[in-house]
C-alpha cells in the first residue's frame, strides 16, 4: 500500500503529522537580547549623558560670560599714554599681529585651530597654553587677568565673540596695545616705547623720534614673557624670537626686504 493512500483520510493524516518532526528554518530563540545590543544601548546612554553635561556646561558658561560688560573696554582709552591703532604705523601693528595672531583680520574672535590646541593643552597640562587670538587676549587681560582656569577659557570665547560684534578690528587692536604688560611696570605700547627706547608709536607726533621696525619687533616679542626677556641684555632665545618675528613681518608684507635687512643688521650688531 502506498504511503499516500495510507494517509488519505484527513483524520489519519492529521494524527500522523502530530508525531512527525517539524523543522522551522526561521525559528528564533526567545529570551534575553544579545549582549551586543545591550552594550550598544548602554553606550548610547553614556554618550547622551555626556552631551547633556557638555550642553549644560556651555550654557552655564555663556550665562556667566554675560556678566562681563564689554562696554567697559572703553575705559582703556582714558589712559594717559593711550595711542589709537589708527595712529600707529602699519609695521608696528604688523609686529604684534604677525607674532600673536596672524589671522586677526579674518576671524570673528577666535581661531578654531589655535583655540582647540589651547583647550587640549589646558586639559592635559592643567594650565592655559598659547593659541589665544588678540581678541581673546584683550578679554583675558581686562576681565580675567588672574584667572587661569579651564572655565575662564570657555567664558573667554563667548566674551571675545561679543567684543568682535561690538567693536571694529582697529578698536580691538587699540585695546590690546594699550592694556598689555611689557615689563618694568609698562602697560601700554606707547609707554613701553618711551621707557625702553625713548621713541613714540604715534606716527603723528613731532616731538619724539618714531619707533623703528626692530624696536617694534622687540616689544612684540617681549610680551610673551615680559619678566623674562631683557631688552638691555638680550638672550639668545630672545634674539631668535625677534628674528623670527621680523621674518614673519616680511612674509606677511608688513615690511619690505630693505626694512627687513636693515632691522636684521641692527639686531645682529
Curated annotation (Swiss-Prot):
MF terms in GO: peptidoglycan glycosyltransferase activity
EC number per UniProt: 2.4.99.28
Entry keyword annotation includes Transmembrane: yes
Reaction catalyzed: [GlcNAc-(1->4)-Mur2Ac(oyl-L-Ala-gamma-D-Glu-L-Lys-D-Ala-D-Ala)](n)-di-trans,octa-cis-undecaprenyl diphosphate + beta-D-GlcNAc-(1->4)-Mur2Ac(oyl-L-Ala-gamma-D-Glu-L-Lys-D-Ala-D-Ala)-di-trans,octa-cis-undecaprenyl diphosphate = [GlcNAc-(1->4)-Mur2Ac(oyl-L-Ala-gamma-D-Glu-L-Lys-D-Ala-D-Ala)](n+1)-di-trans,octa-cis-undecaprenyl diphosphate + di-trans,octa-cis-undecaprenyl diphosphate + H(+)
Classification via InterPro entries: Glyco_trans_51 (IPR001264), Glycosyltr_51/Transpeptidase (IPR050396), Lysozyme-like_dom_sf (IPR023346), Monofunct_glyco_trans (IPR022978), PBP_transglycosylase (IPR036950)
GO biological process: cell wall organization; peptidoglycan biosynthetic process; regulation of cell shape
Statement: the UniProt record of this protein carries the keyword 4Fe-4S: no
Membrane topology classification: Single-pass membrane protein
Transmembrane segments: 46-66
First-listed, main subcellular location of the protein, grouped into a coarse class: membrane
Highest taxon of source: Bacteria
Pathway noted in the entry: Cell wall biogenesis; peptidoglycan biosynthesis
Record keywords: Cell membrane, Cell shape, Cell wall biogenesis/degradation, Glycosyltransferase, Membrane, Peptidoglycan synthesis, Transferase, Transmembrane, Transmembrane helix
Name recorded for this polypeptide: Monofunctional glycosyltransferase
Lineage start: Bacteria, Bacillati, Bacillota, Bacilli, Bacillales
Gene: mgt
